[in-house]
Amino acid sequence: MNPIILSVSVMLILALLRVNVVVALTFSALIGGLVGGLSLSETISAFEGGLGGGATIALSYAMLGAFAVAISKSGVTDLLAHSVIKRINGKENIHAATGVKYLLLCLILLVTISSQNVVPVHIAFIPILIPPLLQVFNKLKLDRRLVACVLTFGLVTPYMILPVGFGGIFLNNILLKNLHDNHLDVLASQVPLAMALPALGMVVGLLIAVFISYRKPRTYAEVDNSELAPTSVEPTFNKRHIQISILAIIAALSVQLYAGSMIIGALAGFMVFTFGGVIAWKETQDVFTRGVHMMAMIGFIMISAAGFAAVMKATGGVETLVQALSTSIGDNKPLAALLMLIVGLLVTMGIGSSFSTIPIIATIYVPLAIAFGFSPMATIALVGTAAALGDAGSPASDSTLGPTSGLNSDGQHEHVWETVVPTFLHYNLPLIIFGWIAAMVL
């Protein structure tokens, strides 16, 4: 059996059985390596060798976590939570409450989209912003699976279509570069256009989640946790701190764009908060520790996913799988497009990162797409969609780990069944459909 299919299947089964994701990734990597023809020592060596590939991401998230905690020190998130609570107080009318619910969802969506480009903190804002709002969600009887879908949409869709922030990294630095490296002559301006139709599939999935799947109210237990819920006293805000926050955000974005590093960008923003007096010098250690603690589990999962990816590369399972499919397809172009997307789904769900999937599949997909007669635009859509598939819906993806880190602050939101499964169904299925259509019509 192909090691990619087996190892991803084992990982998903273990995750669905509520086994820790780090354990599931490590165990499935061992199984995949042994089935793929590697010895136990070779498998362990490949896994350990790949762990370093996730270190940069883990450190990035630690720095972003510290930056997000610094933002919270300015009082911005408390201001938002209290503003929402004031709006729903006395809103016993069902229509008024519904209006507030959709307004809140739109606000969360805008903040999430902004976290990918305007304020590039990625998922680090979620454990800061969402826990104070859980009390609001409970009062509105808002299904947290819907919030998870909204958050994941905002984390994934922008990088598929907007060539700024993380989208600039995905579309230009990774996707376009790998297409050029594999001798596909395309322009940077063509990449977002080719990804527009697959991104529309994400929009369809979001609308289904909002207006069909999770529109009914859902009741959660009121958990007494003073650290999560905002106080009933109206908070006071230091205008100077708000101004410093804006300056820090601008500095973080500017430095990240200039240096091309989330680590340096987050560090710059953190230092602005420190020199600006929002964080006292004696508090910097505590703030940084809180940020690292907040993002630690996500960092460990991403490191484990890098080890898993290294084992999968060492087995040559992706190449074998694609070759087996290409020989069985014949000259059936529609079937070729569908199977290429499904293989991308399997790879990304195992690795947990669409950014890491592109270098793996582009080397094989570009010549294969050219051989089947796909246009350059269709090839862009195939490779880009195949990589994005699985990012929403993988237990090891930061696009699902981030939402869970905020929504499960009171222990009432399960990662696999209430984040992974809903996002998989609402986003991966439309992505396959719209990605296939894009490959056929472009």
Swiss-Prot record:
It is found in: Cell inner membrane. This is Glutamine transporter 1. It comes from the Bacteria. One of its GO terms (biological process) is amino acid transport. InterPro entries: AA_Transporter-Related, Na/H_Antiport_NhaC-like_C, Na_H_antiport_N. GO terms for cellular component: plasma membrane. Coiled coil: none annotated.
